[in-house]
C-alpha cells in the first residue's frame, strides 16, 4: 500500500517482490462473473460523488461524470491526502530550477527541438500552450469538429486523477480549478481531431490549459449550453483566483497525457459492457420466439470448450430459457413430431454462446486495460521526489488505448453481425418457424410489409459497423520531425469505437422492437390457432358425427386427424383468408377426409356411410363460420381480452418486453396503423442512450445465481 513520506510525497511499495510484474493483479481483476461486474459498474455510475485519489478511478465513474444528464447531480471530490504529494513534486521543480538543473520541458525545448535551452520557464510553458492550440473547430463551438462535451468532461476527470498522484510537478490549486469547472458544468471546447495520443493528447488538452491561463481564443460551454469566454467560464465555475500563470512544468503536466483518449474509451466501454449483456439476453429471446431447442445452452457443451465468456453467455441464456413457457410448448411438439422442424437450429441461434463468449472476454479485458490506464501516471518527465530526479520515459504513449479500442470495436462488430444474422432469420418466413414474412401483423399481407424497411436499415447498420471494425492502429504516421515516429492513435481509435457503440445501439433497439413484435405475433398465433381448432372441432362434430338417418357416421373418426392438421399448420400461412382453397389449411383438411374415405373402402358406395359425401357439408359450414371466428379472436386480442394470455408474462425476459410496450408505449406495428417502425425503434434507441433500459435488462437476470444449471 502507498504511504506518505516525510517530504509529503506518496511512497509506493514498488520494490516489493510480490507480483512485481502486475500479472497477478491483472488476473485478479477478472475474477467473478462479467454480469456481476456490469452490475457493479451500474451501481458506481449512479453514485452521487466521485472521489479522486489517483488510483481507484473506474470506467463507470468516468462515464458518470461525462454523462450530460448527470452533470448537475454527480460531483467530484479530491482526496485531501493527495495534496502533500502534489505539492512536493511542484516544489521539487521550482527547487531544481533555482539550482540550475537542466530538465526536459522545463529548461529545454520540446520533442525534436529539445536541444534548445531557456531559463524562462514560465514563458516556455506559455509558448507550449500557444503552439499546441493547433485545432480547427469550424463553425462555432457546437460544430462537428468540436469534441462532444461528454468526452471533454471525461478527459478532465482522468487528467485530474493522473496529476493527483504527485509525479507531474503541478500545483494542487490548478486541479481544484479543473474540479470546479466540472462541478459547475463548465466545459472547455476541445477540437475533435488533431491528436495522435503520443506524446499524449497534446493538442486537445492544450485547450483546457488555454482556458486555465485565460487565452483569448479559449471557449467553454456553460451549464445551460451558452458559449463562454475564459473570464466568464471562471466566474460561472466560481474560480476566484484569476487565470493561472503557469510555473515551469505545469503546462507540460496539463497536456502531456492520455486523458482524452482514455476518457472517451472509458465512456465507450461502459456502454460496450452493457451491450454485451444485452446481446446475450436478446439471443435468448430470439431462441424463445423462434421456438428454438434449448439444449444449445447445456452446460456440459460449454464446459468442454473451457472459455469463460462462452460458459457465462450460455449460462445466462440457459437461465432465461429455463423459465420460458415459449420453450416448453414447442418442446412437446418436437417430441411428438420430430420432423416438424430441423434437428438442429441454425448457427445464429445454436452457436450464439460460442460467438458471443470471446467478444465478452475481449470487452472485459479492454475494460481492465483502460482502468489501468486512467489510474496511471502518463506524462513525461516524471518527478521522483524520493530519489531527487526527473525520469525521462514514454508513459504518454497511449498504446493500451489504441489496442484495446481496436479490439473492443472488432468485438462490437461481431456482436452486430450476430444480431443481423438473427434478425434476418426472424423476418424470413422460410426460417422463422411459422412467423409471418417481415413480421407483418396486419390482416392483409399484401398491404403490410412489416419490418422490410427495418431489415434494409439493419443491413446498412451492419455494413457500417463491419467497416468500422478495421483497425486504426496500423495507420500510424511518423510525426513531429520523426521524434514521434510511432504513436498510438488512441483517441482516433476511441472515437471510431464510440461510433461503433452508437451503431450497435441502433441495431439493438431495432432488433428489440422486432423481437417484441414477434412475441406479440406468437400470442396472436396461439389465439388464432385456438379459434381455428375450436371451430374445426365444432364443425366436425356437427357435420361428421351423424349420418342422414341419425346413425353414427364413420367420418366421425376424422376429427382427431383434422385437429392434428390445425396443430401442425403454420397459422400465418392462412390467417388472412383461412378458407381459401389456395392455402394449405383447407387443402390439408380436405386431404384428411379424402384419406379416410379411401380407407373406408366398400362403404363409400353407400351414400349413408360415404365420407366423400360429407366433404362438401364440412367445408361449406367451415367456410361459413371460420372467417368470423378468426376475426373475432383477433378483435378480442386487440381489445385486451384474448382467450389465451400472452406467454411472455410467465418468462424471465418479460421485463424488457414490458419496458418497450408499457414504459415506452411502443406498440404492435401493422400496415393498418399510421405509426412506422422507425418511430418505435427511435423510442428504444433514445431510452438506450439515456440508460433507461438498464434496469429492465438486469431485472431479467435478477434470479440468476452466477452459475449454470447442474448437469443431471
From Swiss-Prot:
Keyword Lyase: yes
Pathway: Phenylpropanoid metabolism; trans-cinnamate biosynthesis; trans-cinnamate from L-phenylalanine: step 1/1
GO CC term (a single one): cytoplasm
PTM remark: Contains an active site 4-methylidene-imidazol-5-one (MIO), which is formed autocatalytically by cyclization and dehydration of residues Ala-Ser-Gly.
Induction: Strongly induced during the hypersensitive reaction to TMV or to a fungal elicitor.
Example GO biological process: cinnamic acid biosynthetic process
Entry EC number(s): 4.3.1.24
Single GO MF descriptor: phenylalanine ammonia-lyase activity
Covalent link location (5-imidazolinone (Ala-Gly)): 198-200
Signal peptide: none
Positions where 2,3-didehydroalanine (Ser) occurs in the chain: 199
Active site: 104
Pfam family, one: Lyase_aromatic
Family the UniProt entry places it in: Belongs to the PAL/histidase family.
NCBIfam families: phe_am_lyase (TIGR01226)
Assembly: Homotetramer.
Known role: This is a key enzyme of plant metabolism catalyzing the first reaction in the biosynthesis from L-phenylalanine of a wide variety of natural products based on the phenylpropane skeleton.
Family matches, as PANTHER family: HISTIDINE AMMONIA-LYASE (PTHR10362)
Protein name: Phenylalanine ammonia-lyase
Originating organism: Nicotiana tabacum (Common tobacco)
Amino acid at each position: 500500500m502507498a504511504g506518505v513520506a516525510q517530504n509529503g510525497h506518496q511512497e509506493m511499495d514498488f520494490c516489493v517482490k510480490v507480483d512485481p510484474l502486475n500479472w497477478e493483479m491483472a488476473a485478479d481483476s477478472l475474477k467473478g462473473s462479467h454480469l456481476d461486474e456490469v452490475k457493479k459498474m451500474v451501481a458506481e455510475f449512479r453514485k452521487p460523488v466521485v472521489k479522486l485519489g489517483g488510483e481507484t478511478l473506474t470506467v463507470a465513474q468516468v462515464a458518470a461524470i461525462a454523462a450530460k444528464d448527470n452533470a448537475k447531480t454527480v460531483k467530484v471530490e479530491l482526496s485531501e491526502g493527495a495534496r502533500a504529494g502534489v505539492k512536493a513534486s511542484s516544489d521539487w521543480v521550482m527547487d531544481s530550477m533555482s539550482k540550475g538543473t537542466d530538465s526536459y520541458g522545463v529548461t529545454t525545448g520540446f520533442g525534436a527541438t529539445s536541444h534548445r535551452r531557456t531559463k524562462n520557464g514560465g514563458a516556455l510553458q506559455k509558448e507550449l500552450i500557444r503552439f499546441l492550440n493547433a485545432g480547427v473547430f469550424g463553425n462555432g463551438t457546437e460544430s462537428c469538429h468540436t469534441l462532444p462535451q461528454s468526452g471533454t468532461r471525461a478527459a478532465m476527470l482522468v487528467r485530474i486523477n493522473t496529476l493527483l498522484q504527485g509525479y507531474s510537478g503541478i500545483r494542487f490549486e490548478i486541479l481544484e480549478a479543473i474540479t470546479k469547472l466540472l462541478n459547475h458544468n463548465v466545459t472547455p471546447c476541445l477540437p475533435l481531431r488533431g491528436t495522435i495520443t503520443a506524446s499524449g493528447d497534446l493538442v486537445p488538452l492544450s485547450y483546457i490549459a488555454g482556458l486555465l491561463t485565460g487565452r483569448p481564443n479559449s471557449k467553454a460551454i456553460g451549464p445551460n449550453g451558452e458559449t463562454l469566454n475564459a473570464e466568464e467560464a471562471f466566474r460561472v465555475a466560481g474560480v476566484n483566483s484569476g487565470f493561472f500563470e503557469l510555473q515551469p512544468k505545469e503546462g507540460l503536466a496539463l497536456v502531456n497525457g492520455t486523458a482524452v483518449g482514455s476518457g472517451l474509451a472509458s465512456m465507450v466501454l461502459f456502454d460496450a459492457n452493457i451491450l454485451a449483456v444485452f446481446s446475450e439476453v436478446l439471443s435468448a429471446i430470439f431462441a424463445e420466439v423462434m421456438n428454438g431447442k434449448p439444449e444449445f445452452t447445456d452446460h456440459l457443451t460449454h464446459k468442454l470448450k473451457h472459455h469463460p465468456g462462452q460458459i457465462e453467455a450460455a449460462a445466462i441464456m440457459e437461465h432465461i430459457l429455463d423459465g420460458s413457457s415459449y420453450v416448453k410448448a414447442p418442446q412437446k411438439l418436437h417430441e411428438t413430431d420430430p420432423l416438424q422442424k430441423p434437428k438442429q437450429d441454425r448457427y445464429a441461434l445454436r452457436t450464439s454462446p460460442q460467438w458471443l463468449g470471446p467478444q465478452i472476454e475481449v470487452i472485459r479485458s479492454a475494460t481492465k486495460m483502460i482502468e489501468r490506464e486512467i489510474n496511471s501516471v502518463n506524462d513525461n518527465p516524471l518527478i521522483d521526489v524520493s530519489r531527487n530526479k526527473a525520469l525521462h520515459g514514454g508513459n504518454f504513449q497511449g498504446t493500451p488505448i489504441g489496442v484495446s479500442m481496436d479490439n473492443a470495436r472488432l468485438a462490437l462488430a461481431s456482436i452486430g453481425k450476430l444480431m443481423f444474422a438473427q434478425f434476418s432469420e426472424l423476418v424470413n418466413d422460410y426460417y422463422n418457424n411459422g412467423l409471418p414474412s417481415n413480421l407483418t401483423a396486419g390482416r392483409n399481407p399484401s398491404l403490410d410489409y412489416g419490418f422490410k424497411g427495418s431489415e434494409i436499415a439493419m443491413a446498412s447498420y451492419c455494413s457500417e459497423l463491419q467497416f468500422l471494425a478495421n483497425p486504426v492502429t496500423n495507420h500510424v504516421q511518423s510525426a513531429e520531425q520523426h521524434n514521434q515516429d510511432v504513436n498510438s492513435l488512441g483517441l482516433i481509435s476511441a472515437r471510431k469505437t464510440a461510433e461503433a457503440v452508437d451503431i450497435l445501439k441502433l441495431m439493438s433497439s431495432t432488433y428489440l422492437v422486432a423481437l417484441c413484435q414477434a412475441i406479440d405475433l406468437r400470442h396472436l398465433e396461439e389465439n388464432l390457432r385456438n379459434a381455428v381448432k375450436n371451430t374445426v372441432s365444432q364443425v366436425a362434430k356437427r357435420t361428421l358425427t351423424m349420418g342422414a338417418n341419425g346413425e353414427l357416421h364413420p367420418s366421425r373418426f376424422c376429427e382427431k386427424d383434422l385437429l392434428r392438421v390445425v396443430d401442425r399448420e403454420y397459422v400465418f400461412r392462412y390467417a388472412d383468408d383461412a378458407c381459401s382453397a389456395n392455402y394449405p389449411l383447407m387443402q390439408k383438411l380436405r386431404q384428411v377426409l379424402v384419406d379416410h374415405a379411401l380407407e373406408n373402402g366398400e362403404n363409400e358406395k353407400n351414400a349413408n356411410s360415404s365420407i366423400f359425401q360429407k366433404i362438401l357439408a364440412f367445408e361449406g359450414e367451415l367456410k361459413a363460420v371460420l372467417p368470423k371466428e378468426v376475426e373475432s379472436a383477433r378483435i378480442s386480442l386487440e381489445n385486451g381480452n384474448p382467450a389465451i394470455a400472452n406467454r411472455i408474462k410467465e418468462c424471465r425476459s418479460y421485463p424488457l418486453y414490458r419496458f418497450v410496450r408499457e414504459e415506452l408505449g411502443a406498440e404492435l406495428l401493422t400496415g393498418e396503423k399510421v405509426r412506422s417502425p422507425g418511430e418505435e425503434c427511435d423510442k428504444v434507441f433514445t431510452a438506450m442512450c439515456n440508460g433507461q433500459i438498464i434496469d429492465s435488462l438486469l431485472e431479467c437476470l435478477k434470479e440468476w445465481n452466477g452459475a449454470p444449471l447442474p448437469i443431471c
